[in-house]
């Protein structure tokens, strides 16, 4: 056999359901890589003969290998700070009250409009490095802090540029319908003005995004303080006509039926979903839409309404765990902490949490045929951890357990 590298003396949490073991585990295992893909994996005793002198061999010393982690929901490119709003919330102001008073997303919009691409790139690079140090190999980055054509394009350009200069793969999402900008707010004609902004998103922003090939998907914030069902459907229809995947912020603060609409239109995921009901869960199950859990926002906003975890299990909806890294509701740049929070706050099992940041996260980004679990033919994105069981990744936080990271067959962290 001719391989580019071989890993021995490892235990592998493949996260491959076909293995039939918790975590898709193969103990006392080995794995071979060729041309950036996994060429062989299985018990060490069954490893075929290969040219030891011509092949780099890495010894895992009995440690665990997992797929590279995938953060499927971030707002990583932004400028400014909202620490003052943190203080206001601790004094009793709600997220909705701050947003309606012109804070929240709108304050970050102002900072992003004023920042240039170089500043945004450097801020994004620092945050991406922080995630990469925790074993993240793929990240989704949304726009949504521009709310005008120029700034939305600027944010997406920076996200694309980060992907060109970093080993972490970047999937970009156009979130022009994140909030209604101040220039379109009119209390006397709120629906009419927000409809006019949706016109801008659909007729001008999206074509400009497509002209520069800046987005892989389109997202909308469907809530009482943002966009209604009819407006969401308009954006989704335009996105699908443009050939883009769709996903939705839904049921975070209330339930207006966004998840059912997203499911009907074939969305990859619905995200937040604290107020999701059984009808919505059933719709997700029938459409194969993923449920993205964002424990960082739940924690930071001190929410009390839990996502319907038992219903999601009952209907076998793929559960994803993501950081939602953003300046207002989840300024926590740690994917590993999200694994712990998903277990402690939402009562996921450690296996469910890890699946939520690997195999299910890949599904939520539409890349499950290439990454997210370890099997022959899959891209060789994986991490070696100094742990005695895969459950330790969700159990304990704060100690650096990452030993190695391999990205597309190349050792990028050692």
Curated annotation (Swiss-Prot):
Keyword Transport: no
Signal sequence range: none
Co-factor remark: Binds 1 zinc or iron ion per subunit.
Pathway assigned in UniProt: Amino-acid degradation; L-histidine degradation into L-glutamate; N-formimidoyl-L-glutamate from L-histidine: step 3/3
Gene3D superfamilies per the UniProt record, alphabetical: Metal-dependent hydrolases, Urease, subunit C, domain 1
Entry EC number(s): 3.5.2.7
Assigned keywords, A-Z: Cytoplasm, Histidine metabolism, Hydrolase, Iron, Metal-binding, Zinc
Reactions mediated catalytically: 4-imidazolone-5-propanoate + H2O = N-formimidoyl-L-glutamate
UniProt record, GO biological process: L-histidine catabolic process to glutamate and formamide; L-histidine catabolic process to glutamate and formate
NCBIfam families: hutI
PANTHER family recorded: IMIDAZOLONEPROPIONASE, IMIDAZOLONEPROPIONASE-RELATED
UniProt protein name: Imidazolonepropionase
Gene: hutI
């Amino acid at each position: 056999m001719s391989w580019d590298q071989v890993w021995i003396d490892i235990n592998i949490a493949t996260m491959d359901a076909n293995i039939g073991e918790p975590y898709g585990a193969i103990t006392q295992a080995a794995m071979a890589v060729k041309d950036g893909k996994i060429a062989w994996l299985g018990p060490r005793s069954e490893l075929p003969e290969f040219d030891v002198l011509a092949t780099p061999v890495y010894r895992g010393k009995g440690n665990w290998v997992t797929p590279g982690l995938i953060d499927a929901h971030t707002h990583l490119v932004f400028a400014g700070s909202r620490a003052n709003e943190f203080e206001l919330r601790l004094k009793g102001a709600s997220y909705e009250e701050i947003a309606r008073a012109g804070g929240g997303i709108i304050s970050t919009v102002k900072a992003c409009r004023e920042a240039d691409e170089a500043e945004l790139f450097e801020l994004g690079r620092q945050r991406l490095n922080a995630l990469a140090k925790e074993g993240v190999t793929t990240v989704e980055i949304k726009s949504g802090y521009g709310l005008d054509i120029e700034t939305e394009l600027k944010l997406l350009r920076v996200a694309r540029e980060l992907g060109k200069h970093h080993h972490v793969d970047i999937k970009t999402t156009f979130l022009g319908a994140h909030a209604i900008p101040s220039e379109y707010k009119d209390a006397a004609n709120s629906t009419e003005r927000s409809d006019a902004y949706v016109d801008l998103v659909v007729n001008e922003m999206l074509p400009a995004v497509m002209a520069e090939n800046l987005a892989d998907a389109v997202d909308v914030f469907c809530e009482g303080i943002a966009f209604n069902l009819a407006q969401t459907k308009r954006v989704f229809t335009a996105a699908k006509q443009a050939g883009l995947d769709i996903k939705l912020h839904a049921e975070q603060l209330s339930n207006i039926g966004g998840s059912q609409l997203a499911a009907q239109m074939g969305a990859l995921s619905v995200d937040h979903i604290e107020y999701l009901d059984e009808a919505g869960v059933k719709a997700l199950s029938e459409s194969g839409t993923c449920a993205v859990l964002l424990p960082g926002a739940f924690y930071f906003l001190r929410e009390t309404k839990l996502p319907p975890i038992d219903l999601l299990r009952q209907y076998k909806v793929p559960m994803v765990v993501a950081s939602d890294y953003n300046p207002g509701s989840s300024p926590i740049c740690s994917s590993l902490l999200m694994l712990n929070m998903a277990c402690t706050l939402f009562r996921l099992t450690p296996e469910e949490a890890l699946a939520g940041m690997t195999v299910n996260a890949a599904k939520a980004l539409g890349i499950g045929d290439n990454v997210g679990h370890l099997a022959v033919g899959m891209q060789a994105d994986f991490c070696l951890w100094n742990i005695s069981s895969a459950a330790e990744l969700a159990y304990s936080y704060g100690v650096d357990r990452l030993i190695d990271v391999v990205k597309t067959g190349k050792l990028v962290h050692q």
